[in-house]
Structure formats: C-alpha cells, structure tokens
Amino acid sequence: MVKILFLTKGIHSSSARYRALFYQDSFIKDKYHTTHYGLSKKISNYLLALINVARFDIVFLQRKLVPIPYFFILRLLAKKIIYDFDDAIFLNSNGDLSKKRYKRFKYICEKSDLVFSGNQYLQSFAKKINSKTFILPTCLNTKAYQVKAKKSKEFIDLVWVGHKSTVKYLLAVIPNLEKANEKIKKLRIINISNVTLSSKKIKIKNVSWNERIQYQYIKSAWLGLAPLDESNWSKGKCAFKLLQYSAAGIPSISSNVGVNSELINHYQNGILIRKNSDWEQSIIKLLTDKRLYQTMKKNSLILAKDYDYKHNYQVMKNLITNEL
C-alpha cells in the first residue's frame, strides 16, 4: 500500500482543501493510505512531520514555502516529494519578485521529484527549474453546486466569493456596479468572504464564508463577478471562482486577465472586461438580453464539466504512477 503524507497550511486554507485534501477519499478508495499534517505556526507540527516522514512513500507539500534548512532535512528523510502550488507565491502581492520567496521556491522546486502548478503562467516559472513540472488546475465537485436555491424576488443578485487578500479587486469595481444599479435599480452584491463591505448606492449582503452555505448563495445569484487587476500576481490566479459560478450554472463577468481569459469564451459562457468602465454596460447587457443570458448559462455548465475533481484525480494519479 502506497502511503502519502500531505503537508499543507492547514484545513482552513482553500488551496489545501481543493488541491490536496479534496483527493484523500479518492486515494483511499484506490488503496492508498493518506495522512495530513497542517504546518501551522507551531514548531511542534513541523517536528512531527519530520519524525514521521520516513514512514511514507510520498510527501505532498502543498504551497507552503518552508524554510530551506527545513526542506533540506525533509529531502534527506523523504523517499519522494511532490510540490504543489497555485499562486505566484514567489512574488510580492504587488507583482514584484520577492528575493526571499523566490530563493525558497527555487530550492523546493529543484529538489522535488514532481511539481504541480495551477496554470500555464505558474508552470513557466517552475519548469525552468524542474523539467518534471505539470499543470494541474484547481478543480471542484460540480455536483455540490447543483443544489436547489430560489432567486430573490426583491433583488438581482451579483455574487462574489473571495477573501480579505482579494477584496481589493471587488472594491475597485464597486463604483461601476453602483452606476449599473442606477439604471437597473434592483442590483445587490452578495459578498461571500471574511470581510464586511457597505455602500450607499448599492445593496450589499455580507455572507461569512461557509462551504455549504456558499453553494446556496452562488446558485441563487444571477451573475458571478471575477474582477482582477493587470499584474503578475493576478496572472498567477487559477480562476477558481469562475469554475464555482460555472458549476452553479450562472454566467460570469470577469477581468480579461490570466486564466480568466482562457476559461471565458467572450459572449459565449461569460463576458471579459478590458477596462473598469465596461462593467456597467456588460451587466446591463447580460441582464436585459434573455436569449444571451440563457446561452451563457447553458455554456457555463459545459465549462464546469471539464474541471470536475474526478477527472483531475485521474490525471494526478497517473502522474504519480508514471513520473515518480
């Protein structure tokens, strides 16, 4: 029986959930043995991983840029190491290269047996260091989004799912959403995150993120919002919220950046925004053209099928079997 040790930032990390822990049940069904250690700020967790690592055939290090001395010891003790990442973690949040982060990133990629990147942009960095770098998109359980949810009779809901680290992208386009609301009147933003927002010109419903609750709110919305800025950091994003909206069968309006522009077929399964002023007219167009809306809704569901976790698991398992 092959034993896999997942090392992640912890169960509260979305990357850990969707790129590592999500697949534990599938591995177990295929007769693998899996264990998970969250590498939090406690030194004891790091030591526990080192003490036990020799018992495992594969170490799956997800996203964490551990200190080089720690990884050096991990490499000595581990039989095989897979490094997985889904953000431009070698950059500062402003898009500039971080010397400290890149040094760790380079060392970890170089010494790993396999590297999984979330998109082509990220792969381009890692593959220069390790030729065994493969793209594994962040996927989801599409069935989870096929819940029964009624749309509001009072509001036309625009949903956004995010985090305090990404709320700046939503804040940048709220003035444009407010302008759209001047014409449609009933718009409401459903903000699913850990940040509370408010506006005098458009209604905002703040929803604390919860795995099950998010399915209901996404499904009940009319449109999904995915704003980004034009930065290298944004290019490292893997467009997961677009997949969430698509799985729920709602069209998306997104910035024409990075993976967003790869997933969205303009005016087929969503609308790509090139400048902030386009948000207003795109929302109005999509909500007033019923035929266009229904076409995009149908095509959104088709897109989501290609990113179901079951397909991704088979790709991951084949890479582990054939490349390690």
Q: Model-derived features: where do they sit?
A:
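A short, well-ordered alpha-helix in the C-terminal region of glycosyltransferases
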Residues: 292-306, 318
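Membrane-proximal helix-turn-helix segments that form the acceptor-binding/catalytic region
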Residues: 47-55, 69-77, 97-115, 128
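Conserved catalytic-core segment of nucleotide-activated headgroup transferases in glycan assembly
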Residues: 11-26, 141-144, 153-219
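Nucleotide-sugar-dependent
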Residues: 165-168, 212-217, 222-247, 254-262
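C-terminal alpha-helical cap of glycosyltransferases
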Residues: 309-324
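Carbohydrate-associated surface elements
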Residues: 121, 139
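Conserved acidic donor-binding segment of nucleotide-sugar-dependent glycosyltransferases
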Residues: 266-277, 285-291
